[in-house]
Structures are given as structure tokens and as C-alpha cells.
């Protein structure tokens, strides 16, 4: 059985694990080594069983903890070429670690097959479609302002989808953020709203996907209840019954979320 586990998720830091048997991959590391290490320890995950770290992009809420972690644990790092160039130029990845570009087709990383796909953000950014050794498929896509054709393709046919549900539009527009920041978040190079996420999840559940993780919720412009309720309202209007037809789970900001098997 494959598992998706969010170590922490939100605007202050993101990291998750995809595990199958003893082997696993880490996706991003946006908090310090103490926080990440404690999360891995709580899950009884040994560093020696990690096949590598997948990096989505260069923003600090996705790479803040990498440098210190990699000095102690020189794991291979995978990402888009532009992201790896940034990590290298800023000394984030020690010379003892291998770096591998994943801008082409499927890469064999340990026992996993990993395909990167571009997402629309204000720096070069990718999501990952991961095929597990037991034949399951999951896709993680965060930090995207719009669902482009490559994203639609990557999300289709998965057993589990982890998708950004960053903000509630009313909270964002009535909140304390200045206009330029609100505009950035709402733009096609910003983040995905609850409504946009819910509409896509409805398409996916109608195609047969049964497991969903709502990721990267904003602390200032969203709540877990709002994100879930938006999905449930969208599903309900189409006759889809959550918990009967599928599982939808928000990911916790500062602690490990419940395991999602797929």
C-alpha cells in the first residue's frame, strides 16, 4: 500500500512524503531541520530509506530547511534545471549531494517513477506525478495560478491527488493584504483558490479518483473548514457524497497530517 503524508503544509512551510513499503521520497522542505526531523521520526522513517528529495521551486516556504538537512543527510536532490541553478548559486545544496534535473520524461528514483510537469507560478515551478512500486499513481501540484494543460494531464488517472487550495476569494479581497499582493495571488502566476480547486476535484472524482489532499492553505486568507466546505458544496451540487464516494482531507499547517493510503 502506498501512502501520502504531509509533514506540514501552508504558506509558512511545505513538505510531504510519498512512501511505499520502507522506501520513500520527500517533496520540498520548507521548515527547519528540527521540525522536519521530528516529523520523520514520528513516522518511524529512516533517512537511509529515502530515495531522494524532490523540489518544486525556489521559494523559501519550500526550501528553507534544505541546506542544514542536506549537510547532515547528503541525499540526492531533484528539480527543474532553473531551480537547481538557484539552489547551487545560493549554496543551498552542499557539494556532497548529487543534483538531477527532471525536466524531461519519467525518471527512475529508487523504486519510484517520477515525472515533473510545469506549473504557472512567478518563478520556475513544477509539480510531480509519482508512480509507486506497487503500481499506484499520485500527483502533487501546489503554487499554481491556473490549471494549464500539462497540469490537467498530470492530474488525470491518479489514485490520489494533492492539490493547492490556497485562498478563499472573499477573505483575500476583504483582508489586510495590499492590492499588489492580492493581485499577485489571484493572478495566473499566483495561487489556486478554493473554488478553482473544488471545480477540478469534482472533475477528477467523476473520472474515478477517490483520494484528495488539500494543500498549501493560506493562514491569512483561508481556513480548513472553508476549503472543505467549498469542496463539499461543489460535490453536493453534482450529487457526489464525500466520505461515501471519496476522501477529502485538508493538510495541517504545523504538524504531520493523517496518512492517506492510496
Predicted regions and their residues:
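Active-site neighborhood of phospho(di)ester-bond hydrolases with catalytic His/Asp-centered motifs
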Residues: 27-30, 50-58, 78-81, 139-142, ...
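Metallo-beta-lactamase
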Residues: 81-135
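Active-site environment of divalent metal-dependent phosphoester hydrolases
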Residues: 59-63, 84-86, 124, 146-149, ...
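Cap/insert and terminal regions of metallo-dependent hydrolase folds
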Residues: 149-249
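Active-site metal-binding motif and surrounding structural segment of the metallo-beta-lactamase
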Residues: 33-79
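Short, basic/aromatic-enriched C-terminal tail that caps enzymatic domains
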Residues: 246-262
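Metal-dependent catalytic neighborhoods of phosphoester/phosphodiester hydrolases
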Residues: 64-73, 88-91, 222-229
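Conserved beta-strand hairpin/beta-sheet module of binuclear metal-dependent hydrolase folds
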Residues: 1-43, 126-143, 160
Amino acid at each position: 500500500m502506498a501512502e501520502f503524508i504531509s509533514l506540514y503544509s501552508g504558506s509558512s512551510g511545505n513538505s510531504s512524503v510519498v512512501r511505499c513499503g520502507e522506501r520513500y521520497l520527500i517533496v520540498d522542505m520548507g521548515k527547519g531541520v528540527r521540525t522536519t526531523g521530528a516529523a520523520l521520526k514520528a513516522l518511524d522513517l529512516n533517512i537511509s530509506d529515502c530515495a531522494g528529495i524532490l523540489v518544486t521551486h525556489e521559494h523559501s516556504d519550500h526550501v528553507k530547511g534544505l541546506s542544514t538537512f542536506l549537510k547532515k543527510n547528503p541525499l540526492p536532490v531533484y528539480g527543474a534545471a532553473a531551480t537547481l541553478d538557484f539552489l547551487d548559486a545560493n549554496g543551498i545544496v552542499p557539494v556532497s549531494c548529487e543534483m538531477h534535473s527532471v525536466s524531461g520524461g519519467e525518471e527512475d528514483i529508487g523504486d519510484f517513477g517520477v515525472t515533473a510537469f510545469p506549473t504557472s507560478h512567478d518563478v520556475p515551478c513544477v509539480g510531480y506525478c509519482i508512480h509507486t512500486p506497487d503500481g499506484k499513481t499520485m500527483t502533487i501540484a501546489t503554487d499554481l495560478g491556473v490549471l494549464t494543460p500539462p497540469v490537467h494531464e498530470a492530474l488525470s488517472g491518479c489514485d490520489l491527488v494533492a492539490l493547492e487550495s490556497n485562498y478563499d476569494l472573499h477573505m483575500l479581497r476583504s483582508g489586510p493584504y495590499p492590492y499588489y499582493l492580492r493581485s499577485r495571488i489571484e493572478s495566473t502566476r499566483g495561487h489556486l483558490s478554493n473554488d478553482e480547486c473544488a471545480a477540478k476535484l469534482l472533475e477528477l472524482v467523476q473520472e474515478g479518483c477517490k483520494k484528495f489532499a488539500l494543500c498549501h492553505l493560506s493562514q491569512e486568507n483561508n481556513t480548513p473548514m472553508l476549503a472543505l466546505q467549498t469542496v463539499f458544496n461543489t460535490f453536493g451540487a453534482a450529487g457526489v457524497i464525500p466520505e461515501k464516494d471519496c476522501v477529502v482531507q485538508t493538510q495541517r499547517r504545523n504538524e504531520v497530517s493523517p496518512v492517506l493510503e492510496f
